[in-house]
Amino acid sequence: MTKLIFMGTPDFSATVLKGLLTDDRYEILAVVTQPDRAVGRKKVIQETPVKQAAKEAGLSIYQPEKLSGSPEMEELMKLGADGIVTAAFGQFLPSKLLDSMDFAVNVHASLLPRHRGGAPIHYALIQGDEEAGVTIMEMVKEMDAGDMISRRSIPITDEDNVGTLFEKLALVGRDLLLDTLPAYIAGDIKPEPQDTSQVTFSPNIKPEEEKLDWNKTNRQLFNQIRGMNPWPVAHTFLKGDRFKIYEALPVEGQGNPGEILSICKKELIVATAEGALSLKQVQPAGKPKMDIASFLNGVGRTLTVGERFGD
């Protein structure tokens, strides 16, 4: 039985962990995840999905604020683990820890070398990629730069957003890891170096990148909106107030960018630099998320054709 330390944080990681727990070839000696955080306006302390899964399985849990140089790292190195599996952990692993293991692999939610970094699923959508995927890779000190052990792709559809793609790729990652790990541990797979000429980066999204620029095409804005749904959520401004857009569809239309072209009971169409967007799910300032019909029947009932979204 191979003894593992698992490191991860969000739902994506929890799915991978649960997969490992179903395979009797592995023993999870410890789980490392990010510390509990205060979430929302009420600052409710929330455990990570990986911590919740680990508690349900009765596993030992470590939550260092920073792994490097921590007492927790020293404890982990004394457990006698054969290797480390990480999946969206959110911290760099110190070389000292990596060097103490027989192997260390990462489940990364992109088709490397494209989309290295912390937001690969977001950027796959924002940049209009036709496919997404998962790469199992060896861990090295440089971010997502290790040799690739295996890859698996799936198509991106127009119905996908960050939430749906996370769910799909979590299952892909779980299955690919379980399919790959035995042969890798046995030495039957020769990892492939990444083509550095094809590397792209997908860092965590900055607040200023959430703002919609109506001078882009309808397709570009469509991709940005779904590439931030359900988090961090794209926004614009309406009458000076922040206005979040969770879902919109590209449609035909022509007008000044940001201009309202059409309003009816269940449709609000806004011009872009090329074509238009039909807004489907929105959140006005100080209100909950709602469908467009609810918005137009409520706080949006005073809107008129010709008014504009934007600064």
From Swiss-Prot:
List the molecular function annotations (GO) for this entry.
methionyl-tRNA formyltransferase activity
Q: Signal sequence span per UniProt?
A: none
Q: What SUPFAM superfamilies does this protein map onto?
A: FMT C-terminal domain-like, Formyltransferase
Q: Which residues bind (6S)-5,6,7,8-tetrahydrofolate?
A: S110, L111, L112, P113
Quote the catalytic activity from the record.
L-methionyl-tRNA(fMet) + (6R)-10-formyltetrahydrofolate = N-formyl-L-methionyl-tRNA(fMet) + (6S)-5,6,7,8-tetrahydrofolate + H(+)
The family annotation for this protein states:
Belongs to the Fmt family.
Under the heading PANTHER family, the entry gives: METHIONYL-TRNA FORMYLTRANSFERASE, METHIONYL-TRNA FORMYLTRANSFERASE, MITOCHONDRIAL
The protein's name is Methionyl-tRNA formyltransferase
**The species this protein was found in:** Streptococcus pneumoniae serotype 19F (strain G54)
